[in-house]
Amino acid sequence: MDYYRKYTAAILAILCVCLHDLQSFPDREYTMQGCPECKLKENKLFSMLGDPIYQCAGCCFSQAYPTPARSKKTMLVPKNITSEASCCVAKAFTKVTVKGNVRVENHTECHCSTCYYHKS
């Protein structure tokens, strides 16, 4: 019985070391947890029609925390959880016409800014 405990403890220790090593290399996509950083990514659908079209994609900051009692009193509809977030949006873009008459935005620079779709 003691032999199995030592064996299990050794396996768990090796597993923890391996997981720590994998998380130490954030530049590799297969080891990344969650979402990649905010940056330009080619839109394959619109790029098939000619010149490459880029869009901003990735993650920025977000957090949720309990709403303070003082703030809850001033809310029209009190909520227990308050959240803050910033989204990956285009800092600069150019309007491009593809396939004759379809106008799209070709993003040229990205940054983390206010999430407009969260506003009501």
UniProtKB/Swiss-Prot annotation:
Annotated InterPro entries: Cystine-knot_cytokine, Glyco_hormone
One biological process term in Gene Ontology: positive regulation of steroid biosynthetic process
Keywords for the protein's UniProt record, in alphabetical order: Disulfide bond, Glycoprotein, Hormone, Secreted, Signal
Glycosylation sites: 80, 106
Tree of life domain: Eukaryota
Signal peptide: 1-24
Entry protein name: Glycoprotein hormones alpha chain
